[in-house]
């Protein structure tokens, strides 16, 4: 069986990173569902196709919470965390070949890193922009994004409007800034190891010193 792996939320400062893997014996079966790069699909299209993929193909999902990522970053780089998560998503599917989206400038180096966490009988092929090259990766990308969007929506219901969770989102930064200002610490859904959080904490501490 051939598999594809991709993640959503690697660079977000709030919420989890979601990794999905999808298996198939014939890529044309995935193409027939309308699988494409998840970024090019509307939210409704992603949700429908994600449901179709889950109903017809084997898949697995690995979720790394903000706390998980902070703990792992004590001893691993973010690329290593993603590689390990990619490998963990592949294991339940027992595939012989897996296409993964390369999270390193060097495709070969990323292949080696994922392989180091993967079963020895699974060949890893890492490519940049794999989600637009290989249907199984496109399918995994869709599932990962839909699952992450669902989680972010749930977090927003619990914590208030957190935006997309990415540092580039003004809504996310406004939420983080206000939370840190009022609580003197980041929320549990924040990745405290991120420079974004460290900078906001530093600004809060500097402001407190000036007030004093």
From Swiss-Prot:
Record InterPro entries: RNase_H2_suA, RNase_HII/HIII, RNase_HII/HIII_dom, RNase_HII_arc, RNase_HII_hlx-loop-hlx_cap_dom, RNaseH-like_sf, RNaseH_sf
Cofactor binding note from Swiss-Prot or TrEMBL: Manganese or magnesium. Binds 1 divalent metal ion per monomer in the absence of substrate. May bind a second metal ion after substrate binding.
Record's subcellular location: Cytoplasm
GO cellular component: cytoplasm; ribonuclease H2 complex
Domain of life of the source: Archaea
Domain RNase H type-2: 1-206
A Pfam short name: RNase_HII
Keyword tags: Cytoplasm, Endonuclease, Hydrolase, Manganese, Metal-binding, Nuclease
E.C. number(s) listed in UniProt: 3.1.26.4
Listed SUPFAM superfamilies: Ribonuclease H-like
Reaction catalysed by this enzyme: Endonucleolytic cleavage to 5'-phosphomonoester
A biological-process GO annotation: DNA replication, removal of RNA primer
GO molecular function term, any single one: RNA binding
CDD domains: RNase_HII_archaea_like
Cofactor(s) listed in the protein's UniProt record: Mn(2+); Mg(2+)
Annotated residues for binding of a divalent metal cation: 6-7, 101
Family label: Belongs to the RNase HII family.
Family matches, as NCBIfam families: ribonuclease HII
Known role: Endonuclease that specifically degrades the RNA of RNA-DNA hybrids.
Protein name according to UniProt: Ribonuclease HII
Lineage: Archaea, Methanobacteriati, Methanobacteriota, Stenosarchaea group, Methanomicrobia
